[in-house]
């Protein structure tokens, strides 16, 4: 099966990596809207328009399924995109909630949602979690992580300062952290390490990774089996510099 993966930039590589590892599709067309990243600081109307324009991009490629790997677009544009599409479109929020249902049985477990400003303000995760009975939910807009990751700053003083700025004021330590932006799994180990070191935790919080979550979701929904296909062919496209995007993909995905 030939599918598409849409993201605002390189963050969707975290989803793509999980898809490549699972080998459940034959061919993947990746489109990064890198000329307009970040999405998280833009208004909902603009994000919806970006989503519809992404649909126009994919039409000539004749894909059978589209994955919206961007949490911000999933929160604010997914419904509009689905209305204008004849093929199934899957976002990353519903799979993440399903992963929590499967892994977190304590409905009172403190859950922290990390995301861009736009994703957090949409309340998409908060509302979905409450519908499943999880009421001890807090959220934190951590938009500064996005430009750091886009610049391949995945460790070091700048990232440490950014984590300190966001996480020091936390009053309740989470047992579950939703990485509510597909950029964030690229610094997941650093986030986990920060919580362990600075809050003296005996065990790390459970990190919900949208890439792993969406593979599980797709397997369940479409009865797909891991390793059913050969290693997928991947084709990269971008609204900005596609050469730069391909270079980042080779470095991060080891292609």
UniProtKB/Swiss-Prot annotation:
Its EC number(s): 5.1.1.3
Record-stated family: Belongs to the aspartate/glutamate racemases family.
Gene3D superfamilies the record matches: 3.40.50.1860
Organism lineage string: Bacteria, Pseudomonadati, Campylobacterota, Epsilonproteobacteria, Campylobacterales
Alphabetical list of NCBIfam families matching this protein: glut_race
Keyword Isomerase recorded: yes
Pfam families for this protein: Asp_Glu_race (PF01177)
Identification of the protein by name: Glutamate racemase
Binding locations of substrate: 7-8, 39-40, 71-72, 182-183
Catalytic activity: L-glutamate = D-glutamate
Catalytic residues (positions): 70 (proton donor/acceptor), 181 (proton donor/acceptor)
Disulfide bonds listed in the record: none
Taxonomic source organism: Helicobacter pylori (strain HPAG1)
Pathway: Cell wall biogenesis; peptidoglycan biosynthesis
Coiled coil: none
SUPFAM superfamilies: Aspartate/glutamate racemase
């Amino acid at each position: 099966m030939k599918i598409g993966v849409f993201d605002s930039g390189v963050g969707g590589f975290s989803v793509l990596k999980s898809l490549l590892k699972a080998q459940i599709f034959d061919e993947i067309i990746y489109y990064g809207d890198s000329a307009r990243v970040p999405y998280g600081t833009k208004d909902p109307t603009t994000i919806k328009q970006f989503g519809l324009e992404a649909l126009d991009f994919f039409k000539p490629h004749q894909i059978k399924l589209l994955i919206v790997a961007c949490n911000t677009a999933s929160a604010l544009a997914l419904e509009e995109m689905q209305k204008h599409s004849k093929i199934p479109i899957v976002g990353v929020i519903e799979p993440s909630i399903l992963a929590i249902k499967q892994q977190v049985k304590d409905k009172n477990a403190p859950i922290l949602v990390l995301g861009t400003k736009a994703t957090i303000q949409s309340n998409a995760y908060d509302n979905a979690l409450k519908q499943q009975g999880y009421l001890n939910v807090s959220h934190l807009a951590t938009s500064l992580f996005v430009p750091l990751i886009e610049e391949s700053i995945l460790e070091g003083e700048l990232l440490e300062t950014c984590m300190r700025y966001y996480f020091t004021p936390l009053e309740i330590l989470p047992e579950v952290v939703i990485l509510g932006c597909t950029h964030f799994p690229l610094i997941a180990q650093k986030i986990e390490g920060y919580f362990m070191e600075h809050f003296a935790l005996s065990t790390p919080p459970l990190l919900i990774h949208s890439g792993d979550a969406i593979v599980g979701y797709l397997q369940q929904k479409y009865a797909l089996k891991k390793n059913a296909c050969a290693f997928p062919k991947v084709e990269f496209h971008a609204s900005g510099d596609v050469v730069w995007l391909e270079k980042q993909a080779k470095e991060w995905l080891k292609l």
